Design a protein with these regions (language model features):
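Histidine-rich, glycine-flanked metal-binding segment
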Residues: 1-54
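Divalent metal-coordination and catalytic microenvironments
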Residues: 9, 24, 29, 49, ...
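Acidic, glycine-enriched loop/beta-strand segments at the rims
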Residues: 12-23, 314-318, 324, 368-374, ...
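Divalent-metal coordination cores built from histidine and acidic residues
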Residues: 52, 61, 71-162, 182, ...
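Histidine-centered catalytic micro-motifs
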Residues: 55-66, 165, 191-197
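Structural preference for beta-strand elements that scaffold enzyme active sites
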Residues: 87, 113-117, 158-160, 188-192, ...
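Active-site neighborhoods of metal-dependent hydrolases
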Residues: 134-140, 146-159, 163, 223-366
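C-terminal cap of metal-dependent C-N hydrolases
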Residues: 318, 325-332, 337-338, 401-450
Length: 455
């Protein structure tokens, strides 16, 4: 007796780039039969007319902040589930919003809408050891402490180390390398970074990240290239990364499908000179929380928000969409949301990225190929994270599945209402159990915390 059977679906074979018309048989959290499945099942989903995809994997997003949710509600985890994501990677851009141990304990105790893995963030570690001036290098004593804390996090099960170089200008190249003292050369880990500077400085930033990868001898993920290089130099940036890879440095890249980025208004991203670099003005910045929710800045509001509300999320409409599409289509680039919310406010990418890619760029604009898009949201990130049982619909693999209506799938979240649910996601299955049934969330506690190597 099967636990769950999905029948009459258009099963996406990502590896062979084809559609298999048929069924999936699921038992004990895994796919055990494919094709024409005759075995009886406790539950049956009729997926006729719908695509059956591996659950989407978001390799770059930003987890809940328990100081805001008080551990009483789900924020971004809920929006991830709504768009068909089944596994996420937290702790990006150098920033853990709480300790990895706390995140793990919360999920193991209460469950979660989606599965999580996590980096340990360099910027987070700096705060833990008292290196709180973002414009100053850490002392050698602080670096020694961070070296030990990095190893402890890796031993606990962290994916690797993430950096927020732009957020903390005091992190120089030497410090970024030095904190990896006890983990260098480990091919089972992954480093990632939010670049040093964007736009006219993007190529220098890419070279710096390549140098970190070279010196640490650890595979490296360049985060959200779209917000680094979609200012007139995306072609050059992609070519540079290709050449770096040809020289034996293990780099990969992710990007999100929006021409605006989001971060805290008080961050160093908005330091003096940013508008000149982007060739934009104050009115390209929209604030997302009261007392300025939905307000586009002038100089006075911009400076007031930076001073009085530094943790407020802002949206910067400063990138070129044609270069976003160029990045999304490049063979090295996988798709990730970079989603982040504060009190349910923020950027719509955290609720719309994956449906937007399929609905807008594949179906409507025809600027991406279907199998390429699915690969970039499933198998590519699974391989990069060394997930042995995720990213494919295959016998023996985890039954993490998204079922969608290709004709209807689309993002609905906006900058004014950034957590609106997408359309077209019919079912989501985590570990063989139904989380979303016929478009309705029926179980939001199926997710678990995976330590590195467990999935």
């Amino acid at each position: 007796m099967l636990d769950l059977k999905i029948v009459n679906g258009k099963i996406i074979d990502v590896e062979n780039r084809k559609i298999i018309e048929g069924d999936l048989g699921i038992k004990d959290g895994a796919i055990i039969h494919m094709g024409h499945v005759t075995a009886q099942s406790r539950k049956v989903i009729d997926a006729e007319g719908h695509y059956v995809s591996p659950g989407f994997i978001d390799i770059h997003m930003h987890e809940e902040d328990f100081t805001l949710t008080k551990k009483q509600e789900y924020d971004i985890s809920a929006t991830m589930l709504n768009m068909g994501v089944t596994t996420c990677v937290a702790g990006n851009c150098g920033n853990n919003r709480q300790s990895i141990e706390m995140l793990s304990e919360f999920i193991e105790e209460k469950g979660n809408p989606v599965n999580y893995m996590s980096y340990i963030g360099h910027n987070y570690l700096r705060n833990q050891v008292g290196s709180t001036d973002i414009y100053k290098r850490s002392t050698m004593s602080q670096i020694k402490k961070m070296q030990s804390m990095t190893l402890e996090a890796i031993d606990f099960g962290a994916v690797g180390v993430s950096y927020g170089l732009e957020y903390c200008p005091g992190i120089d190249l030497e410090e970024a390398i030095e904190i990896t003292e006890h983990i260098r050369g480990r091919n089972d880990l992954l480093l990632s970074a939010h670049y040093r500077k964007d736009a006219v400085n993007a190529l220098d930033s890419i070279n710096e990240m390549a140098e970190i990868a070279k010196e640490t001898k650890i595979p490296f993920q360049i985060s959200h290239l779209s917000s680094c290089s979609a200012f007139g130099n995306m072609t050059e940036a992609l070519k540079l990364i290709e050449n770096i890879k040809l020289n034996g440095i293990d780099l990969s890249v992710d990007a999100y499908p929006y021409a605006a980025f989001s971060t805290f208004i008080g961050s160093a991203v908005f330091d003096e000179g940013c508008f000149e670099s982007w060739n934009k003005s104050y009115d390209s910045i929209m604030l997302t929380e009261e007392p300025f929710k939905g307000v586009y800045c002038n100089r006075e509001i911009f400076e007031k928000a930076r001073k009085e509300y530094p943790q407020m999320l802002a949206v910067a409409n400063v990138m070129n969409e044609d270069e976003i599409v160029e990045a999304l289509n490049h063979p090295m680039v996988m798709i990730a949301s970079d989603g982040i919310y504060r009190n349910h406010s923020g950027h719509p990418r955290g609720a719309g990225t994956f449906p937007r890619v399929i609905g807008h760029y594949v179906r409507e604009k025809k600027s991406m190929e279907f199998f390429d898009a699915i690969d970039k949201m499933t198998l590519m990130p699974a391989k990069r994270l060394k997930l042995k049982r995720k990213g494919l619909l295959k016998e023996g693999f985890d039954a993490d599945i998204a079922i969608f209506d290709f004709d209807r799938i689309i993002d609905k979240a906006t900058f004014q209402d950034p957590q609106l649910r997408p359309e077209g996601i019919k079912y989501v299955i985590l570990g063989g159990q139904i989380a979303i049934n016929n478009g309705n969330v029926i179980n939001n506690t199926l997710g678990r915390f995976y330590k590195r190597g467990e999935a």
